[in-house]
């Protein structure tokens, strides 16, 4: 065996037999007694090592060497090692931490080994002299081998000290069986002497002789320091998997196989195969020096070319068997005898994944199954990525890797190995069946629950999705979230706002996660239409049961442009989509709620939208559950997307109601929706409409349909994406108008409150068609600073206020406005203005953000100063109302921009004019403006606040008497107002 290995290893000690015998004796002694104790690796020792490394670099820079810039390139490796050591020292800069580092067992051994290897390289130059410049000399080969060792040491220090912080005790071994062995014998140790390791390994896998032990050490000890680190052990177990037959595999592949080359580089493999260029099928294999833990196989093609490849997702013996069958790997190292490796292919038991009842219920709610691959939604999961543990189907993994995808498609972790798995389906019980029947099957499919990492990776699936089926996006009712499957397993920190709703859904924690997954799903840029979002493609490949009509296709210009239809996932109403005109059908939540644009509030908005999505067939209970779960998830999403609060200006609402921007991912409710009880009571107070709305809250779907049935509100509700209740719908409509879909989106409190009256009116009038990007926030009645601090509370207030205001408004509006008069496309100026608005205005900032208010502030400050609104109400609602009112008008055009034919009430222009006058440059005739101003002044003279007067006039279409009756009923804070402060 030793002879065969020497023959295949040009770096063997055959050049100097006497020296080789001496070194062999030294190795035997060290193997028997173990390595000496290491001195502390203090700063002085590290700096001394740096000097030695620098000397090696200078020697290697001699032009006579003519080193090739190919791996392993020592002139890159040593400087990188130096930089990483500097990073480590910077993390342990103070005296106490530095003392801990200098006493770290692994670090001491590493520095000592690095110093010895550097001295050895220097000595090599001194002894080799001119022979070092001969490319085929043994001394030059020894330098190449040292380069490989330095390369292994660099990879090891980066793995044990990622980002300069010691993580050796937390290092994750890829193979579960191997990890169990290490934990059992060595606990959390990072490195152990070879002698100790050999004894422990012998207890599990018998080592037949001392000669075999020496050969095994030369294979495992990649850094040649007489120690085995957890990193080296992980590499070895990945190379010669599976663990159950690891020594047998090693004997077949490394000891006796003529194709195995130890410590060879890419260039050396190419040079070695050059002599077999006339013998196609000749091959050799080596450890990849750039991807430790994987094999590199070099072979001669039929036309005499030499190629090298790294097999993925299969053991080496399987790759060699497959290549032999295909005619690629026939002659190992040019020899006619090709070992038969089929004996290593003993069927290994698949890892069985048991589906828990909780997972079963969760996936029932989504209308999917745990077994289904969440990337393609076509095949069952049959492979597990190691070490992260994500599950998917083999075809998706292969497509991802062939598209040059780096790391796990879910979490971006390095793929160190894969394991075949079988998912054992859960045997449905009565509870599970009941859960499935309650939840709409069109709920968003969630990510696998098998992932621990909650990473943004928000880009992770875009590439794979595009590789898979980009064209199916529009047709598929469902989109897979971008978050990692395992991430779903981890329950998010409960948001205080979510807490009231957690008990409603059948599986509250999971529903929250669903929302979370939705928001996280990678979507097109804010300016891109939801349809074009690659993330949408992934799950749409395979629609969930009874897929609704394509939600993403923009419907023909609706009578009222759908503001932001509820997400396919969240809205259970999509089922009803069949009964609703295509334009009315809500868009998928992804399209509706741009997580980035809306931020936290958007998430809430998304919940609302989803809840509001029309679905007549859904029971009240299901709608309530969906609503609350969505609300909870929105909060989760809000947390995650606060950084995205501002949607880009480009965000536009399409005729189908989709936001062109990321906003489409998370529609309207910015603020955590007030408890359902608060929303419903407010609705009930408003009257029959409110009652219907409260019922709708229970049946988001049913309620939405009902509202749609109401003529004036019909276009509005459709556009606005049915929300949990009227309150919700109104907020949604606001988003349509250009408010972040929901009143809550902008300063949910203020907006929602104001939007309660104007929004309803707007929706009745068709204003709901405004796009989120177009929103022109009206100046907050109160100074923006007040609104911004109260965003969170205002959001809560907004829903209740909106509900209270909406019912009466809804009644009036419904009576006054024709249900389906589609106004002509909004003037170009509106769309332009809305588009020109700052991104903040276009995407209403979440309840916690002032971005949306900022644009309105400049216009509204004077106004707000003139008429202070009641503190309880205005704090949250005034700015929102003003913004919303103006945005409703302005955004109607913007939504029309997206669709070019937003449905509007018969008199949209006057409403726009009023808001525009205050919020933007007046676009309407001066006479009309003066007329509106006179009416506003008249009503303000009666003691009403400016914003309320403005909203009332907008709803009443500038009819003073109707506006006065509205103000009498809604001018003062409704009985629910205390809830706004919650």
UniProtKB/Swiss-Prot annotation:
Pathway per the UniProt entry: Protein modification; protein ubiquitination
Gene Ontology cellular component list: cytosol; glutamatergic synapse; nucleoplasm; postsynapse
Zinc finger (RING-type) boundaries: 373-412
PROSITE patterns named among the record's database cross-references: CBL_PTB, UBA, ZF_RING_1, ZF_RING_2
Residue ranges with Pro residues bias: 544-566, 819-828
Location of region: Interaction with SH3KBP1: 891-927
Domain Cbl-PTB: 35-343
Primary gene name: Cblb
Protein name: E3 ubiquitin-protein ligase CBL-B
Record-listed E.C. numbers: 2.3.2.27
Binding site for Ca(2+): 221, 223, 225, 227, 232
Binding site for 4-O-phospho-L-tyrosine: 286
Class of this enzyme: transferase
UniProt cross-references to Pfam families, sorted A to Z: Cbl_N, Cbl_N2, Cbl_N3, zf-C3HC4
Region of interest (Interaction with VAV1), residue spans: 543-567
Biological source species: Mus musculus (Mouse)
GO biological process, one term: positive regulation of T cell anergy
Keywords: Calcium, Cytoplasm, Metal-binding, Phosphoprotein, Repeat, Transferase, Ubl conjugation, Ubl conjugation pathway, Zinc, Zinc-finger
InterPro entries: Adaptor_Cbl, Adaptor_Cbl_EF_hand-like, Adaptor_Cbl_N_dom_sf, Adaptor_Cbl_N_hlx, Adaptor_Cbl_SH2-like, CBL-B_RING-HC, Cbl_PTB, EF-hand-dom_pair
